Amino acid sequence: MIARIWSGESPLWRLLLPLSWLYGLVSGAIRLSYKLGLKRAWRAPVPVVVVGNLTAGGNGKTPVVIWLVEKLQQRGVRVGVVSRGYGGKAAAYPLLLTPETTTAEAGDEPVLIYQRTGAPVAVAPERAAAVKAILAAHNVQIIITDDGLQHYRLARDIEIVVIDGVRRFGNGWWLPAGPMRERASRLKTVDAAIVNGGVARAGEIPMQLAPGLAVNLRTGARCDVAQLSNIVAMAGIGHPPRFFATLEACGAHPQKCVPLADHQTLAPADVQALVGEGQTLVMTEKDAVKCRAFAEDNWWFLPVDAHLSGEQPDKLLQHITSLVR
């Protein structure tokens, strides 16, 4: 229903317009207060790169963060990552991730980024506190913040927006009548716009999510996902249909697709109940970091990597590395 409202297919979005106007008024006032100097943002002693969205829902932001961290690491840059830690609840903040940190403490995306990149990762509701925790423990040269485009309390040097190239901005309205956190005109002020799928427009960087080999959660064995049989697909991400479409494109045709809420807590019994005798469970890598501790032999995940095309990605990386002292 939400997808139909935000796309404009359902006329119910009109009923929510008063709330959207209020949301837009408040969010605009907050941003203006920082632009006018009425509120002060905290500036880190190292450059800060924000990777965020203009819309709610999954746009492929986390794969972009991983891509950016890995590309900078390949250039010899010491990178730290901060996040709000949605879906997690730590005993105390800021929380600096370790190999023992769980998704229940830090959230699924920070744990995934930490496991994939090995970069220092810290979470806190106040992102400045997370930055300070990393700087106190690690000699990093740059900070990447996973989400937080609208978190103006943290000053930033570069802003990158990730856009779903198929859904784009839906009906164009602020939450809750539409998907927008800020209006599309905000794109004029960011340093780069990366478009996940669909067709990129002038000045935007095209990106595709390229699936790798399926990985068994228990053994680490790898195989082409199309070789798996009797698949039940599970996706607890911002836009589950994208994952299900990826499986179809890979030649894996799920018998059943189970969409879950983004950052949803997964109980062992609930996940186990999804799979019947002789079936194979295939999930996203983000779900896998929550399920690995209680995984069964027939559970697999499909990792995806961000592939950015054209000359713009190299120019963006050069611009970012030029800020590193």
Swiss-Prot record:
Transfers the gamma-phosphate of ATP to the 4'-position of a tetraacyldisaccharide 1-phosphate intermediate (termed DS-1-P) to form tetraacyldisaccharide 1,4'-bis-phosphate (lipid IVA). InterPro entries: LpxK, P-loop_NTPase. Transmembrane segments: none annotated. It catalyses: a lipid A disaccharide + ATP = a lipid IVA + ADP + H(+). ATP binds at T55, A56, G57, G58, N59, G60, K61, T62. This is Tetraacyldisaccharide 4'-kinase. Pathway: Glycolipid biosynthesis; lipid IV(A) biosynthesis; lipid IV(A) from (3R)-3-hydroxytetradecanoyl-[acyl-carrier-protein] and UDP-N-acetyl-alpha-D-glucosamine: step 6/6. GO terms for cellular component: plasma membrane.
